[in-house]
Swiss-Prot record:
This is Splicing regulatory glutamine/lysine-rich protein 1. The gene is SREK1. One of its GO terms (cellular component) is nucleoplasm. The keyword Flavoprotein does not apply. Residues 66-142 form the RRM domain. Residues 180-189, 260-355, 419-488 have a biased composition (Basic and acidic residues). The lineage of its organism: Eukaryota, Metazoa, Chordata, Craniata, Vertebrata. CDD domains: RRM2_SREK1. It comes from Homo sapiens.
Amino acid sequence: MTSLMPGAGLLPIPTPNPLTTLGVSLSSLGAIPAAALDPNIATLGEIPQPPLMGNVDPSKIDEIRRTVYVGNLNSQTTTADQLLEFFKQVGEVKFVRMAGDETQPTRFAFVEFADQNSVPRALAFNGVMFGDRPLKINHSNNAIVKPPEMTPQAAAKELEEVMKRVREAQSFISAAIEPESGKSNERKGGRSRSHTRSKSRSSSKSHSRRKRSQSKHRSRSHNRSRSRQKDRRRSKSPHKKRSKSRERRKSRSRSHSRDKRKDTREKIKEKERVKEKDREKEREREKEREKEKERGKNKDRDKEREKDREKDKEKDREREREKEHEKDRDKEKEKEQDKEKEREKDRSKEIDEKRKKDKKSRTPPRSYNASRRSRSSSRERRRRRSRSSSRSPRTSKTIKRKSSRSPSPRSRNKKDKKREKERDHISERRERERSTSMRKSSNDRDGKEKLEKNSTSLKEKEHNKEPDSSVSKEVDDKDAPRTEENKIQHNGNCQLNEENLSTKTEAV
């Protein structure tokens, strides 16, 4: 049986051993009911299984269905081996796991069967006495936590480590055996004790034996030296000399072999130390590399963060610049609007001044007023004469038609006014068109247009003055014959009245 760690109790299925190895008989543990051992009982399938939790791994559902909870166990007497042997009678057991605190009087366990059909049989043991307590058996809601299975990579690493250890041991053994094999050929007859020492592979035993052999060798050499002295005193024979030389050779070979063993062991130990140091250095280098990599990653992250910050700052600066440009544009637009307003005001002032000048130029001269007064006086005379003519006989119509055909100054004045209005409208339209073109054109063209406007205004003023002067001359010329006609009419009227009287008399 495999030994169990205290408090753990994860137990695989061992080779079947007799129950006497546990020291507890099944009769003392508890009586198994006959119904549980009978596989043909229909009532066993009717035991309902509890519903599983929602967060259960679907790969472990089969394991949970095959596990059983066993409670009310005596923590001092019951072991996993006893539970395994007890539940083997029901079916094939895969794992047994002891759980709970060992210091408490009661513990519980989980038993996983190989087949799900053995679970209802195990549930039939509920209430059976196990030792001095009745068992509490029920379905399990959890699967047994098993040790992680070895991956092929981990297994390969373990094999490599084991093979390295085996090779080191083989090299150590071969180094220890090689000098002993050479000595055994020289020593024939089993005189050397190093051969027996080489068979013992433990370092402690070999070390102790070496100490003993050294002490024995010293005592023997001391005794031999004494015996040699005695022999020299007694007799010096060639046979004794040969034995002494052989012994010397043997002692030298033994010491030489021991020195070689020590040297080989020391070399092996030094090699192992060097290897361990190299491994430690490699580990330290790997750690330093990892640290450098982490530092490099951190530096890269810091650089990226700084770049992002710089980009954000540049974006903010660009936004501020755009805002400033927009403000400057708005200011320029406002300035342009103010300039346009001032220009419009100047234009309106110029137009008003032009109109005032035109009105002043349109006012008739004194000669025109005098002619008007003469006309009004002539009209009054006509009215008086017409009144008198109503009393007197009517005059001929031919003379009146002649007088009406002469152009009157009122009609001429109206035509002049219409022409002036048309000219004003044309000039205003031109000014509006020029104002629109002035807005589109640049500031350089504004000065040129102002000069053109001034020149056109002067020309218009001169043009307006010329027709006014011509109109006044025409009025004066027309007034002079009118006065002559009036004079003629005065004389003619008298004649007409006489003729009218003659015609009336004839009619009567």
